[in-house]
Amino acid sequence: MGFYKNALISAGLLSCSLWASAGPLTDYSLIVFEDLSPSGSLHVHGRTFIGGDLNGSSPEFANALDKSLTLDTVEVAGDLNASGWLKVNAGALAYGGANNLSGVNCNGNAYGGSASCLHQVSGLDDKAASLYDTLKGESIYYAGLAATGNVGGGLFSYAGVDDLAVFEISGADLFNSNWALDLGAASYGIINVSGVNLSNSGATNLNSGFGNYTNILWNFYEADTLNVGNQWKGSVLAVDAVVSTWNDFEGSLAAKSYVGYGQVHNFPWGYTPPEIELPEPSVLLLLLSGLGLLGWRRARSA
């Protein structure tokens, strides 16, 4: 069993700008910081990062990626515990713990259905901590943006001229209605959702306007548990939440852990936050302390 402990933001970051390039939700379809324990056979169509153990039955990864890839399309900091046959359909699988798999098919061109794409590496715990810091920072940044769009009558609408539309809604209101989206002149929409324990009983469907999955981000910045229920359109940022669903994600997902059985399709979040100059180290550390921006590092019991 593993656990997370607090980690300081490295001093090297203090002299840099924040988010000068696309973030992890562009690079990965699925990121979890603890175990991946799907309740059914999970298919992830893009890249995957798992900060804990890989559990579940007969998971499949990299379904929609180029089979000529040889980079690590799946990274698991902990143990490989999945039952049945694990399939890596493009690229390789890197892991940091023990390999307890009963069967593996590496279906990329370089591996020919063998198990040769698996390799053990070090440093994935540190990468998990870095990814958490980055995505927690993005979530806090997005949550602090002023709302520029309107919410009501089952519609998210934007009438401004900026490239980014920002909406605010409570989880209770979100999961009490069907919704449509009208971004107007904006290319991207961020929907900040408040609430700690959130669940869609099946009453909520995302209808017209949600078809461009790469341009929508749901920021569940307070969530500890989240069940989105039906097919969810757009990327989901819920770094401290245990997430579940009984349908598919049409976008990237970043969560504490994932216990659902829907597929995660390869529609990465397409927006890059603006370049932001960080304040002096002492000011920054006080700010991060106040916001609760703490890194997480996975430690393994002896």
State where each predicted segment sits.
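A short, hydrophobic C-terminal helix/tail in secreted or cell-surface proteins
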Residues: 279-297
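N-terminal signal peptide c-region/cleavage motif recognized by signal peptidases
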Residues: 15-20
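Contiguous hydrophobic, core-forming segments of folded domains
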Residues: 90-91, 95-146, 159
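Bacterial N-terminal signal peptides that target proteins for export
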Residues: 1-8
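Long, polar low-complexity repeats
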Residues: 23-89, 130-275
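Short, charged juxtamembrane terminal tails flanking transmembrane helices
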Residues: 299-302
